[in-house]
């Protein structure tokens, strides 16, 4: 099966999600699947795009036997809520354009749903390609942000709750 793994975090980043996602990719390859990855330029946790990746909007290349599509991101300079939102949205928009124009012939789009805004991108690319969409939900959004006190705006909470339900109802 040909699988596109869609995630904001991927090596050479060394944060938790990038590590387990890389392990998942390697395990699926060992099981005989073909893998491609659509991800952001590495920037976490420093908040700046890593050397060797700077100054690019898109990049395609093979990394450890995997075709990796990297898409522009505005790295968050701080851990502040709105900086992270801007970062999430920048990757959402750039990955939509890259995914819809460059990804070809996949059977499944396995999406790590952080941020929530990646769901509609995965669904749009999946519809274009006739691929099934699987969501991997790591955090309970938007409830984690609400509980931490980072999200208090009632309108924004309703929008994110709507997006959460939309994602669940449109995944395969």
PLM features per residue range, with description:
Residues 34, 67, 132:
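Residue-level detector of anion-binding/catalytic polar loops
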Residues 31, 100, 117-120, 124-129, ...:
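Membrane-proximal helix-turn-helix segments that form the acceptor-binding/catalytic region
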Residues 15-16, 47-48, 80, 119-123, ...:
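Short glycine-/acidic-enriched loop or helix-start segments at secondary-structure transitions
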Residues 8, 73-83, 126-162:
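Acceptor-binding helix/loop patch of EC 2.4 sugar-transfer enzymes
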Residues 84-98, 108-138, 142-143:
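An aromatic- and histidine-rich active-site surface loop
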Residues 1-64:
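N-terminal subdomain of nucleotide-sugar transferases
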Residues 17, 88-92, 160:
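Conserved donor sugar-nucleotide recognition element shared by glycan-biosynthetic enzymes
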Residues 39-94, 98, 103:
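A conserved catalytic-core segment of Leloir-type glycosyltransferases
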């Amino acid at each position: 099966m040909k699988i596109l793994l869609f995630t904001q975090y991927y090596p050479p980043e060394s944060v938790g999600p990038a590590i387990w996602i890389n392990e998942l990719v390697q395990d699926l390859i060992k099981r005989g699947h073909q893998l491609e990855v659509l991800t952001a330029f590495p920037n976490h946790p420093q908040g700046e795009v890593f050397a060797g990746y700077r100054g690019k909007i898109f990049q395609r290349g093979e990394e450890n036997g995997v075709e990796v599509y990297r898409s522009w991101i505005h790295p968050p300079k701080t851990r502040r809520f709105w900086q992270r939102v801007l970062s999430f949205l920048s990757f959402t928009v750039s990955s939509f354009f890259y995914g819809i124009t460059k990804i070809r012939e996949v059977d499944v789009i396995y999406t790590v749903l952080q941020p929530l805004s990646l769901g509609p991108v995965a669904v749009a690319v999946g519809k274009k390609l006739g691929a099934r969409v699987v969501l991997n939900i790591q955090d309970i959004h938007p409830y984690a942000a609400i509980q931490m006190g980072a999200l208090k705006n009632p309108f924004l909470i309703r929008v994110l709750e709507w997006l959460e339900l939309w994602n669940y109802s449109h995944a395969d």
